């Protein structure tokens, strides 16, 4: 609250005035471009190939530079009736190797937000704080998805104390 008031006072700028500069589709494509540049991984949408609990939920898969599947994630980014408030990442399935069957279970996670949905054919517009939230939760998702640890109890964020998970 105070920080927002200082921004308004010092810079005559509010979060609401910034929204038009952050349409969600462009923020997501920019986020994916950064991830590809930094980590050499590609993010591809595959929403139609999986079951989803709501039409606004999307599903993506991550691939390395050699097109090997690394894992997948769901984006459930919009507020709706009956949905818990806030933003978070939850691991659904951790990386795990079944040595006896020579099989590797790939990680899957959910990244959840409560952004304002698109209205009247116009895209969802984010505040700067919401952009930061999306990047923050996506960072947790990458931690879960890109782990090389193959024991699910300690793979990704599972092996990190909760107070340390939020340090970055």
Task: Annotate each predicted stretch with a short phrase.
Residues 1-114, 164-165:
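Active-site-proximal, well-structured secondary-structure segments within enzyme catalytic domains
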Residues 79-82, 120, 151:
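A short local loop/turn or secondary-structure capping micro-motif enriched for an aromatic residue
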Residues 20, 24, 123-131, 154-158:
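Alpha-helix N-cap/helix-initiation motif
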Residues 150, 159-168:
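Post-HExxH zinc-binding segment in Zn-dependent metallohydrolases
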Residues 145-156:
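Glycine-rich phosphate/pyrophosphate-binding loops
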Residues 35, 117, 122-145:
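Active-site recognition of the HExxH zinc-binding catalytic motif
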């Amino acid at each position: 609250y105070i920080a927002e008031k200082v921004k308004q006072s010092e810079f005559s700028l509010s979060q609401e005035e910034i929204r038009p500069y952050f349409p969600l589709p462009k923020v997501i494509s920019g986020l994916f471009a950064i991830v590809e540049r930094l980590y050499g991984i590609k993010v591809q949408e595959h929403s139609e190939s999986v079951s989803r609990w709501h039409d606004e939920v999307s599903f993506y898969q991550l691939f390395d530079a050699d097109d090997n599947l690394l894992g997948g994630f769901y984006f459930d980014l919009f507020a709706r009736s009956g949905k818990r408030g806030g933003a978070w990442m939850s691991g659904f399935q951790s990386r795990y190797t079944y040595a006896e069957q020579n099989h590797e279970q790939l990680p899957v996670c959910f990244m959840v937000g409560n952004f304002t949905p698109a209205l009247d054919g116009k895209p969802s517009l984010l505040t700067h704080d919401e952009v930061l939230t999306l990047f923050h939760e996506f960072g947790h998702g990458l931690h879960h998805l890109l782990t090389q640890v193959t024991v699910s109890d300690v793979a990704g964020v599972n092996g990190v104390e909760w107070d340390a998970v939020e340090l970055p």
